C-alpha cells in the first residue's frame, strides 16, 4: 500500500517535446563573444587607462587623427591618442606645449575661409 495516491506521485513538469526543443536550440546556438570588436568597442573600452606611457613630441605633419579621452571611471587622467600616417598609434602628453599648438592649429584650420 502506497502512502501517496497515483495522482500525487506525478510531478508536473515540462513535456519531453519542450525539453527536446530546448536542447536542439542550445546545440544550434553558436558559441562566441556577444560583442565583437567593432564600433561598439570604442565606446565600451576596458576599464583601465589606454596610455601607460606618453611620448613628448611628434611632428604635427605625421599625425592623421587625434582622439581625446576624458577623465572617467576607466582612468583618472585625460588621454590623447594620436594616429600617425604610418599606421601606428601613440599616446601624447596632454600638457605638452607642442600638443596644445597642434590642437590650436587644427581648430584654426577648420575656421579658415578659402
UniProtKB/Swiss-Prot annotation:
Compartments reported by the entry: Secreted
Signal peptide: 1-36
Gene3D superfamilies on file: 2.40.50.40
Listed InterPro entries: Chemokine_b/g/d, Chemokine_CXC, Chemokine_CXC_CS, Chemokine_IL8-like_dom, CXC_Chemokine_domain, Interleukin_8-like_sf
Alphabetized GO MF terms: chemokine activity; CXCR chemokine receptor binding; identical protein binding
UniProt keyword terms in alphabetical order: Cytokine, Disulfide bond, Secreted, Signal
Protein modification: N-terminal processed forms ENA-78(8-78) and ENA-78(9-78) are produced by proteolytic cleavage after secretion from peripheral blood monocytes.
A Pfam family reported for this protein in Swiss-Prot or TrEMBL: IL8
Superkingdom field: Eukaryota
UniProt name for this protein: C-X-C motif chemokine 5
Amino acid at each position: 500500500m502506497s502512502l501517496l495516491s497515483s495522482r500525487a506521485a506525478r510531478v508536473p513538469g515540462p513535456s519531453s517535446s519542450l525539453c527536446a526543443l530546448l536542447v536542439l536550440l542550445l546545440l544550434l546556438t553558436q558559441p562566441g563573444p556577444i560583442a565583437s570588436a567593432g564600433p561598439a568597442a570604442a565606446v565600451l573600452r576596458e576599464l583601465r587607462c589606454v596610455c601607460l606611457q606618453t611620448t613628448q613630441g611628434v611632428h604635427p605633419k605625421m599625425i592623421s587623427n587625434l582622439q581625446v579621452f576624458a577623465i572617467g571611471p576607466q582612468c583618472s587622467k585625460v588621454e590623447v591618442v594620436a594616429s600617425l600616417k604610418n599606421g601606428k598609434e601613440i599616446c601624447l602628453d596632454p600638457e605638452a606645449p607642442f600638443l596644445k599648438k597642434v590642437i590650436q592649429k587644427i581648430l584654426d584650420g577648420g575656421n579658415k575661409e578659402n
